[in-house]
Amino acid sequence: MASEPNLRYPTEETGDRGPQGPPGPPGPQGPPGPQGPPGPQGPPGPQGPPGPQGPPGPQGPPGPPGPPGPSGLPGLFVTNLLLGIIILLLLIIVAILLVSKLVVN
């Protein structure tokens, strides 16, 4: 049956084809596409602020002992010598004052 010619519109009786109809309305929007690949890595951020100051370090070991001091006898001798000279000068001044007082009288 499908091989029989269409008898309702024989080719001899059909007229010229009419003008083309207007275009149909646009179809519905398609589904969204797949997600794209991730973008490239951004540049490194700025340097952060300096951290807090650390705790003080442990106390260092004690230093080596100092050299021995000078002997005490020469220092004592110099001190006694200076005191003796000062006392001697004071006695000479007192003697001069006493002699001058006696001479004036």
UniProtKB/Swiss-Prot annotation:
Pfam families the record matches: Collagen (PF01391)
Superkingdom of source: Viruses
Ranges of biased composition (kind: Pro residues): 20-71
Positions on the Cytoplasmic side per record topology: 1-75
Subunit structure: Binds to host RAS and TRAF2.
Other noteworthy facts: Saimiriine herpesvirus 2 transforms T-lymphocytes, including human, to continuous growth in vitro. Two viral proteins, Tip and StpC, are essential for this function. The virus induced transforming activation is used as an important tool of T-cell biology, including HIV replication.
Extracellular topological segments: 97-105
Protein name: Saimiri transformation-associated protein
TM regions (residue ranges): 76-96
Chief location: host cell
Residue intervals of the Collagen-like domain: 15-74
InterPro entries: Collagen, Collagen_superfamily, StpC
Keywords linked to the UniProt accession: Collagen, Host membrane, Host-virus interaction, Membrane, Oncogene, Repeat, Transmembrane, Transmembrane helix
Membrane topology qualifier: Single-pass membrane protein
One record GO biological process: extracellular matrix organization
Any GO CC annotation of this UniProt entry: host cell membrane
Record carries keyword Nucleotidyltransferase: no
Chain's role: Acts synergistically with Tip to stimulate NF-kappa-B activity and interleukin-2 gene expression by binding to host TRAF proteins. Activation of NF-kappa-B protects lymphocytes from apoptosis, thereby facilitating viral induced cell transformation.
Cell compartment(s), UniProt: Host membrane
Annotated segments matching region Disordered: 1-75
GO molecular function, one term: extracellular matrix structural constituent conferring tensile strength
Highest classification ranks of the organism: Viruses, Duplodnaviria, Heunggongvirae, Peploviricota, Herviviricetes
